[in-house]
């Protein structure tokens, strides 16, 4: 069983169910565009690896916590800037948690407490980057 210490970023969309209920195809298209045009390149710039995607979220592994936090801050600032002029009820906003922890590697996936913590931290109040 392979173990390693890694920095983990977990993110999900605030109000995803509401956004999907209001405009399913528009939300999916907007989120896919945001990921491909902005978020995925930011992850790459910070040497991140997308471990898994969910409908409204992602789990990303980084070689250092500095990279993970820098990526999170840049994503939050960029998303905020991209939301200017978008009606509040149609904005795509993210909750992001970052942790450093020991993980178990299974294929391309990572498991363990190191992965669980950032998901719990996303529930805390958002900080403005």
Model-derived segments and spans:
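Catalytic beta-strand-to-alpha-helix segment of the class III nucleotidyl cyclase homology domain
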Residues: 40, 59-129
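Catalytic NTP-binding/metal-coordinating core of nucleotidyl cyclase/transferase enzymes
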Residues: 1-78
């Amino acid at each position: 069983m392979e173990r390693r210490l890694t920095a983990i970023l977990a993110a999900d969309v605030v109000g995803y169910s509401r956004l999907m209920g209001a405009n399913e195809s528009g939300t999916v298209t907007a989120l896919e565009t945001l990921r491909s045009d902005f978020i995925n390149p930011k992850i790459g710039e910070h040497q991140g690896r997308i471990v898994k995607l969910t409908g409204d979220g992602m789990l990303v592994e980084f070689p250092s916590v500095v990279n993970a936090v820098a990526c999170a801050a840049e994503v939050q600032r960029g998303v905020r800037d991209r939301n200017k002029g978008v009606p509040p009820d149609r904005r795509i906003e993210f909750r992001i948690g970052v942790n450093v922890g020991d993980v178990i590697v299974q294929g391309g996936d990572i498991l363990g407490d190191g992965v669980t913590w950032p998901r719990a931290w996303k529930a805390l109040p958002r900080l403005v980057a």
